[in-house]
């Protein structure tokens, strides 16, 4: 597996396990997204990572702020999207290994 993809997966798993909070996750994800020494990420995996990136833009843990904008999502929805991303990345890894 590509080392850059593994870093993204490990970061997502840390967040889901509660090892880091959403603010730490957002900061680390952004830093990793713009890492200069990143390996080339295949298009299918990048689409998944980019989708998580998009969810970071609409994730708002504060209920009062979320009420002002209908497009904002809560932590439960965000975690669900992270779980889907990990599952889809694993699926792609397994498909690649079968060829």
Locations of regions flagged by a protein language model:
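Acidic, Ser/Pro/Thr-rich low-complexity regulatory regions
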Residues: 1-99
């Amino acid at each position: 597996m590509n080392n850059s993809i593994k870093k993204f997966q490990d970061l997502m798993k840390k967040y889901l396990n509660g090892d880091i909070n959403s603010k730490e996750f957002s900061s680390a994800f952004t830093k990793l997204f713009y890492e200069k020494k990143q390996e080339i990420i295949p298009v299918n995996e990048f689409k998944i990572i980019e989708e998580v990136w998009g969810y970071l833009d609409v994730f708002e843990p504060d209920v009062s702020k979320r009420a002002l904008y209908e497009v904002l999502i809560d932590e439960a929805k965000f975690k669900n999207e992270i779980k889907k991303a990990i599952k889809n990345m694993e699926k792609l890894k397994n498909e690649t290994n079968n060829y």
